[in-house]
């Protein structure tokens, strides 16, 4: 992400300005503090691994796409608009089979976590 300073200026002229990678990374981790502990741990681990994996990317298109996607994610979690989010058919059609499997696994895990918290909450009554 060495060429990102030039990219910020370019993207700023075309639309929303992109945050520098380190600022975005820190803001996402701060936003995760509002999550329940299990979700926070999962989110923090995922964010850290993704930023680490993309640390040495030099392709400007990949850098812009990566930062724009994470900035959209940050905006969603900081405004709680993720709760009403859905995936369009066109977005799912663009996903690779590996991404669809990951999405399915994530869905299963979140349903299990939701079921476990609902069960533990009902046992306290």
From Swiss-Prot:
It comes from the Eukaryota. This is Succinate dehydrogenase assembly factor 3, mitochondrial. Its main location: mitochondrion. It comes from Eremothecium gossypii (strain ATCC 10895 / CBS 109.51 / FGSC 9923 / NRRL Y-1056). GO terms for biological process: gluconeogenesis; mitochondrial respiratory chain complex II assembly; succinate metabolic process. It is found in: Mitochondrion matrix. Coiled coil: none annotated. The keyword Repeat does not apply. Interacts with the iron-sulfur protein subunit within the SDH catalytic dimer. GO terms for cellular component: mitochondrial intermembrane space; mitochondrial matrix. Pfam families: Complex1_LYR_2. InterPro entries: SDHAF3/Sdh7. Residues 1-42 form a transit peptide. Plays an essential role in the assembly of succinate dehydrogenase (SDH), an enzyme complex (also referred to as respiratory complex II) that is a component of both the tricarboxylic acid (TCA) cycle and the mitochondrial electron transport chain, and which couples the oxidation of succinate to fumarate with the reduction of ubiquinone (coenzyme Q) to ubiquinol. Promotes maturation of the iron-sulfur protein subunit of the SDH catalytic dimer, protecting it from the deleterious effects of oxidants. May act together with SDHAF1. Belongs to the complex I LYR family. SDHAF3 subfamily. Keywords: Chaperone, Gluconeogenesis, Mitochondrion, Transit peptide.
């Amino acid at each position: 992400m060495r060429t990102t300073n030039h990219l910020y200026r370019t993207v700023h002229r075309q639309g929303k300005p992109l945050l520098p990678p380190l600022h975005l990374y820190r803001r996402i981790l701060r936003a995760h503090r509002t999550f329940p502990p299990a979700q926070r741990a999962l989110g923090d681990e995922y964010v850290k691994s993704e930023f680490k994996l993309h640390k040495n990317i030099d392709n400007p298109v990949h850098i812009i796409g990566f930062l724009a996607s994470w900035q959209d994610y940050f905006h969603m979690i900081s405004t709680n608009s993720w709760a009403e989010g859905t995936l369009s058919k066109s977005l799912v059609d663009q996903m690779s089979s590996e991404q669809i499997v990951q999405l399915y696994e994530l869905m299963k895990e979140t349903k299990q976590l939701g079921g476990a918290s609902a069960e533990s909450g009902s046992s306290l009554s």
